[in-house]
């Protein structure tokens, strides 16, 4: 535990629960202008009660925020998440107690979109295989300039299905279009997107898409959304990526 300064009378207490999840270069000094600041590097669910007992504000990432973990935090007024997803919060309980909760919306749009393509190209381009092949010296020793042991296809002309067309999904669609892909989209909640992309049902998206990526929050609509049975079993060269919130949990 790090206590940045001594508390003063009637000063708000801010408890940062998972500092390590933010990286070693994170600076917390701006919080000191708002009140007493206590920093914990990590926090488990079992440690929550003791660490939040007299907190006015807690700053968390993935630790569960519910009656079992903050039920005795009688001064708690605000939960700040250093992430986008709300799936670790019991929203009904927080609303019942009048505790506000805020996330960091939109901070990762470009990064997650970039990572989506990093995952795709690693698999699609067989990068692990060809990296090892070149490093082994086999390419240099080979008698033929070409090597076709692992084939891959171009994105141009392929169909990319996107589950969840929020900010990240739209960014992925924009990049995929630049590669020449046709975009399909699906809304797990049944909402109609304001988009020119073709919106279809889940089964149609899975059957028509060469590539499928999920960019949806983990909630009641997406829990167990993806199961093995939903994927076409007779197709090869299809790619599925889920840089979202574990919508294929069993």
Describe the predicted segments one by one.
Residues 1-55, 184:
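N-terminal glycine-/charge-rich "phosphate-binding" loop or analogous flexible N-terminal tail
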Residues 41, 82-83, 99-110, 187, ...:
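Short beta->alpha connector loops at strand-helix junctions that form conserved
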Residues 169-170:
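N-terminal Rossmann-fold NAD(P) dinucleotide-binding loop
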Residues 99, 105-159:
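Phosphate-binding beta-alpha-beta segment of Rossmann-like dinucleotide-binding domains, i.e.
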Residues 87-97, 244-250:
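Rossmann-fold NAD(P)-binding glycine/threonine-rich loop
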Residues 65-69, 184, 188-250:
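Rossmann-like adenosine-cofactor binding region
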Residues 165-166:
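Glycine-rich Rossmann-fold phosphate-binding loop(s) that bind the pyrophosphate
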């Amino acid at each position: 535990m790090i206590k940045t300064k001594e508390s003063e009378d009637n000063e708000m207490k801010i408890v940062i629960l998972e500092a390590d999840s933010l990286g070693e270069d994170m600076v917390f000094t701006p919080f000191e202008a708002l009140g007493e600041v206590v920093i914990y590097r990590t926090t488990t669910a079992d440690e929550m009660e003791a660490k939040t007992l007299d907190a006015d504000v807690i700053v968390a990432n993935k630790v569960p925020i519910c009656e079992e973990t903050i039920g005795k935090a009688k001064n708690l007024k605000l939960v700040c998440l250093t992430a986008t997803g709300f799936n670790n919060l019991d929203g009904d309980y927080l609303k019942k107690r009048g505790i506000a909760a805020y996330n960091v919306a939109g901070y990762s749009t470009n990064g997650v979109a970039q990572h989506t393509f990093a995952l795709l190209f690693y698999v699609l381009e067989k990068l692990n295989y060809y990296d090892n092949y070149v490093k082994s010296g086999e390419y240099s020793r080979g008698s033929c300039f070409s090597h076709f042991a692992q084939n891959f296809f171009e994105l141009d002309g392929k169909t990319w299905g996107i589950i969840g067309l929020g900010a990240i999904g739209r960014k992925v669609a924009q990049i995929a279009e630049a590669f020449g892909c046709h975009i399909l989209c699906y809304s797990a909640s049944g909402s109609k997107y304001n988009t020119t992309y073709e919106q279809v049902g889940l089964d149609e998206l899975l059957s028509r898409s060469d590539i499928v990526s999920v960019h949806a929050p983990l909630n009641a609509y997406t829990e167990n959304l993806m199961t093995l049975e939903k994927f076409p079993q007779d197709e090869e060269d299809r790619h599925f990526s889920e840089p979202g919130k574990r919508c294929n949990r069993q």
